Amino acid sequence: MRTVKEVKVKDYILDGKKIYIQSMLNKRSDDIEGSVDQAVELEKAGCDIVRAAIPNMEAIKLIPAIKDKVNIPLVADIHFDYKLALAAADAGVDKIRINPGNIGDIDRVKQVAVTCANKNIPIRIGVNSGSLEKHILERYQAPTAEALVESALYHVKLLEKFDFENIVISIKSSNVKTMIESYRLAALKCGYPMHLGVTEAGTERIGIIKSSVGIGSLLCDGIGETIRVSLTGDPIKEIYAAKDILKAVGTVSYTHLRAHETLSDL
């Protein structure tokens, strides 16, 4: 059985003993009321962790607004601007998702790591097949599992260089086989918790099929601490699909069963 390094996200412990369901808000970041309402509905549906895109400083207002209305952990999704990560941490977010390769030079990554360490905020390193570093892509000629894992582990080592080990990893691909191979390879090389998902999963039917195969296979291997079934449209359906996957592989907790619904109930 894989030994998982314990990471705490608000009140949750990611240690391999329980699987947590995650979803992402899809309202405009300037629609604070709509975003808050959606977060509330996701929590009611059984979502354990909710993620919100923070594309600009104005969107930082989302963080206290959402945290005031829901009890589940809130993740800030940050791209390109390290200052957004710093502001999100100051605003009280529970976890930050970044790709260290696209937020600037090493000094900026260090500032994010130091700030998050001081506030005990975990960082999810989010690597996906569509945003591999150019030099890695040139070496492998394609976003292979080996290329994706090399990128993820480089960023892990970068954070570790700054004495930051409060890390969660995601290595996503729209190709299900590549996604499975990537996580299996990464699981052999490091013990950090892993967030499972298939990027660009697509429409509801195709998205559920791809996510079920990818996420389900890895859960059966004992890999994965949080999961997200990425679907277009209403994110509530992501929760129902995730519950069905957990039930199918026999890892549903009482919490998930209590709120369980299937897509046929919609």
Listing of model-derived features with the role each one plays in the protein:
Residues 8-27, 62-64, 124-140:
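N-terminal small/glycine-rich loop or linker at the start of catalytic domains
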Residues 19-33, 75-78, 138-147, 202-207:
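Active-site mouth loops of central-metabolism enzymes
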Residues 21, 77, 125, 169, ...:
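Conserved, mostly hydrophobic/aromatic
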Residues 45-65, 100-103, 170-173:
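Glycine-rich, proline-tolerant flexible connector loops at the mouths of alpha/beta enzymes
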Residues 59-76, 112-120, 186-191:
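Alpha-helix-loop-beta-strand connector modules within alpha/beta enzyme cores
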Residues 104-162:
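Conserved anion-binding
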Residues 137-254:
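Catalytic alpha/beta core domains of metabolic enzymes, predominantly
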Residues 255-262:
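Conserved small/polar residues in nucleotide/adenosyl-binding loops
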